[in-house]
């Protein structure tokens, strides 16, 4: 099966190439935190030879509670991303929530992300596709992997084939998510790069009444399981103080564990990508 390669700057993204890391923090809590986190990600990924894209949200528009922290907003968020790009020379990715945001975000960010909860919103999908930017499409918790072909088709019909698919878990009853490992193979059949959002797959949505809980202790186990499928990349959030993070702290890796974590995953990815294919159909 041929696999499509997406290029972001000098980074090549494909299921049969070394994995790329979309890594950062959940939300732009502050400019200082974004710079601190990106500095550590850059240090570790350069040391290990992992292609890297910084990620964060300028607005968390789907928080459980009306009082939850959402972020700095579009204008300030884009200023922070510009500072990160200028300082560290890395591409950036962030999510878009409304059609009018698509072009202003694409003007600054190298990859724009379609949120899982909004992945069937045609007006948003088309607006994002028409920017011509690379799009990371999060698979909704309520969609089967084979249904992603319809979202891909919407983007393609709008003239954009610079697309990435991203698994982030499926609803399993109330307040729980599971990851169907067979789904990765199904999505890879579309030939676009497939990523695994291990952080949000660890969520327990609404598990803390007014916010999501999570299972940080299992991040290494789940990440290894995902990358063993031979994927284009990993989507990860890390925080210097997860217990006091303003969003999704229970799912975030401790930033001081990043090097040990990625060292093992790099070794696993190298091993898996060197296996010859076995035809079992």
UniProtKB/Swiss-Prot annotation:
rRNA processing listed as a keyword: no
Recorded family membership: Belongs to the KdsA family.
InterPro entries found in the cross-reference section: Aldolase_TIM, DAHP1/KDSA, KDO8P_synthase
Enzyme class, spelled out: transferase
Reactions accelerated catalytically: D-arabinose 5-phosphate + phosphoenolpyruvate + H2O = 3-deoxy-alpha-D-manno-2-octulosonate-8-phosphate + phosphate
Signal peptide region: none
Keywords: Cytoplasm, Lipopolysaccharide biosynthesis, Transferase
GO biological process, one term: keto-3-deoxy-D-manno-octulosonic acid biosynthetic process
Protein name according to UniProt: 2-dehydro-3-deoxyphosphooctonate aldolase
Species assigned in the record: Stutzerimonas stutzeri (strain A1501) (Pseudomonas stutzeri)
Pathway: Carbohydrate biosynthesis; 3-deoxy-D-manno-octulosonate biosynthesis; 3-deoxy-D-manno-octulosonate from D-ribulose 5-phosphate: step 2/3; Bacterial outer membrane biogenesis; lipopolysaccharide biosynthesis
Protein localization: Cytoplasm
NCBIfam families noted in UniProt: KDO8P_synth (TIGR01362), PRK05198.1 (NF003543), PRK12457.1 (NF009109)
EC number of the protein: 2.5.1.55
GO CC terms of this entry: cytoplasm
Single GO MF descriptor: 3-deoxy-8-phosphooctulonate synthase activity
SUPFAM superfamilies: Aldolase
């Amino acid at each position: 099966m041929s696999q499509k390669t997406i290029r972001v700057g000098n980074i090549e993204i494909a299921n049969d190439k070394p994995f790329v890391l979309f890594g950062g923090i959940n939300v732009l809590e502050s400019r200082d935190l974004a710079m601190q986190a990106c500095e550590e990600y850059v240090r570790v990924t350069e040391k290990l030879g992992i292609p890297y894209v910084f990620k964060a949200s300028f607005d968390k528009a789907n928080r459980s509670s009306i009082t939850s922290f959402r972020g700095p907003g579009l204008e300030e968020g884009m200023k922070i991303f510009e500072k990160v790009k200028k300082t560290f020379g890395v591409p950036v990715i962030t999510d878009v929530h409304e059609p009018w945001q698509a072009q202003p975000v694409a003007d600054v960010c190298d990859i724009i992300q379609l949120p899982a909860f909004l992945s069937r919103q045609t007006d948003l999908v088309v607006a994002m596709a028409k920017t011509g930017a690379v799009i990371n499409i999060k698979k909704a918790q309520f969609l089967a992997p084979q249904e992603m072909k319809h979202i891909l088709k919407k983007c393609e019909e709008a003239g954009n084939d610079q697309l990435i698919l991203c698994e982030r878990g499926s609803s399993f009853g109330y307040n729980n998510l599971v990851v169907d490992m067979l789904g990765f193979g199904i999505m890879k059949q579309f030939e676009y790069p497939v990523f695994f959002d291990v952080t949000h797959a660890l969520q327990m949505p609404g598990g803390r009444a007014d916010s999501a809980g999570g299972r940080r202790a299992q991040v290494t186990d789940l990440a290894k399981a995902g990358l063993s499928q031979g994927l284009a990349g990993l989507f990860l959030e890390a925080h210097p103080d997860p217990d006091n993070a303003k969003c999704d702290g229970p799912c975030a890796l401790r930033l001081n564990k990043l090097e040990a974590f990625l060292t093992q995953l790099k070794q696993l990815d190298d091993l898996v990508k060197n296996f010859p294919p076995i035809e079992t159909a």
